[in-house]
UniProtKB/Swiss-Prot annotation:
Oxidoreductase found in the keyword field: no
Record Gene3D superfamilies: 1.20.1530.20
Assigned protein family: Belongs to the monovalent cation:proton antiporter 2 (CPA2) transporter (TC 2.A.37) family.
Alphabetic keyword roster: Antiport, Ion transport, Membrane, Sodium, Sodium transport, Transmembrane, Transmembrane helix, Transport
Organism: Synechocystis sp. (strain ATCC 27184 / PCC 6803 / Kazusa)
Name the record gives this protein: Na(+)/H(+) antiporter NhaS4
């Protein structure tokens, strides 16, 4: 790497994290999750705004020579973000209203997933898709992208609106926890099928990830309990222990990539099996989250923004398809949640609010889309449409939930 490239990468990082922080704070002032502002900041640095205003500046500031380095940093950011998602997956949520949560979450995945598959028939052959895209992998990715709920963003919305301690907050966190596990399993299947190009060929990969997950949940969990109990210095997370855990996160990511699933699953699995509700786990989350959220994730948003080009939607027909994607995603999730919870005896207002809460997609949607784009399953046009869907479904959540189900403080 020559000096000019190094300086340009450092300049990229300065602009990326600075703009992400600025736009994130701006959105927070309007009671929106800062992550939405950070996603939009990334889009602003790509062809949708910077490239539109000055194509020459965009190409010179984000040339092809720097993008591999941004990609590497964004992948590392995703590994550790997924580690945090797993770490925050608290078992106490899974024990509360479990029957309602399991039924609601699975139906709320099934409805939009089916709509996604139906939509795939239309989208695959009518839009400019990669030539070698097969229907089954494409449909699985579209279904997964329509079905996901962003647990961390949902938790942040509940906290910011003062609803985290209410019955709605408890049920929402429980449903989102179950939804998270189910949706990541669905994505794992989509990746396995895509990489082998057929369902039966994916069986060895799926068997491998099942064996690894079972191993981590049983022996791995016991091992880390022992490590944290014996090497945590009076509930203090030493640099040595922190280093060991980070090495294990990367090693777990390497193993899931080697098995044939994406690196993000390694981070998620390791975070999920670590002991929860201890001073050490809290300190681990705190030390990790600040650097990941302020430095690494904005780079991921910027890298995603370079692939998001609103200019690709240059015909009314394409915007109509985009509107159809947004409508199907919202309707599938909302109807799945509302119908199920009402059938299970949940009050009408709570069921309505939960339907909108579970529509929160945010950053989690971006992760699925980037995996699909990386594997060549979805085109930049479809990528852009689903990024728009992720932003819209997340932006509308807070105001609608507060209007339907105001917290006691309101």
């Amino acid at each position: 790497m020559d000096t000019n490239t190094l300086l340009l990468i450092l300049a990229n990082i300065i602009v990326i994290i600075g703009l992400a922080r600025l736009i994130g704070l701006l959105f927070a002032r309007f009671q929106q999750p800062p992550v939405i502002g950070e996603i939009i900041a990334g889009i602003m640095l790509g062809p949708s705004l910077l490239g539109l205003l000055s194509p020459a500046l965009e190409k010179s500031f984000f040339p092809a020579t720097t993008q591999p380095f941004l990609y590497l940093l964004s992948e590392i950011g995703l590994i550790f973000y997924m580690f945090l998602v797993g770490l925050e997956l608290n078992p106490q949520y899974l024990r509360q209203k479990l029957k309602v949560a399991i039924l609601t979450s699975n139906v709320s995945i099934f409805f939009p997933f089916v709509l996604g598959i139906v939509l795939s028939f239309f989208v695959l052959y009518s839009l400019n898709q990669p030539n070698k895209t097969s229907f089954i992998p494409f449909a699985l990715f579209i279904g997964a992208a329509m079905s996901i709920t962003a647990f961390p963003v949902l938790a942040r919305i509940l906290k910011d609106t003062g609803l985290d301690k209410t019955p709605l907050g408890t049920l929402g966190l429980t449903c989102a926890s179950v939804d998270d596990i189910s949706a990541w399993c669905l994505l794992a299947i989509a990746i396995a099928v895509t990489r082998t190009d057929n369902i039966f060929g994916a069986f060895p990969t799926l068997l491998g990830i099942i064996v690894y997950t079972v191993f981590m949940v049983t022996l791995g969990r016991k091992f880390f309990k022992y490590i944290l109990r014996n090497y945590g210095q009076k509930n203090y997370l030493s640099q040595g222990l922190l280093t060991f855990i980070y090495i294990m996160v990367i090693l777990s990511a390497m193993l899931t990539e080697w098995i044939g699933i994406d690196v993000i699953f390694g981070g998620f699995i390791l975070g999920a099996i670590l002991p929860k509700n201890t001073n050490l786990s809290t300190e681990l989350a705190t030390k990790t989250e600040d650097f990941v959220s302020t430095f690494l994730l904005p780079i991921f948003f910027a890298y995603s923004g370079l692939s998001t080009d609103l200019g690709l939607l240059n015909k009314p027909y394409l915007w109509a398809v985009c509107a159809l994607v947004v409508a199907a995603a919202i309707a599938g999730k909302y109807c799945g949640v509302y119908v199920t919870t009402r059938a299970l005896g949940v009050e009408k207002q709570e069921a309505k609010a939960l339907g909108w809460l579970m529509n929160t997609r945010g950053l989690t949607e971006l992760i699925i889309l980037n995996v699909g784009l990386k594997l060549g399953v979805i085109s930049p046009v479809i990528f852009t449409m689903f990024v728009i869907m992720a932003i819209i479904t997340t932006i509308i959540t807070s105001p609608l939930v507060v209007k339907i189900y105001p917290a006691p403080a309101h």
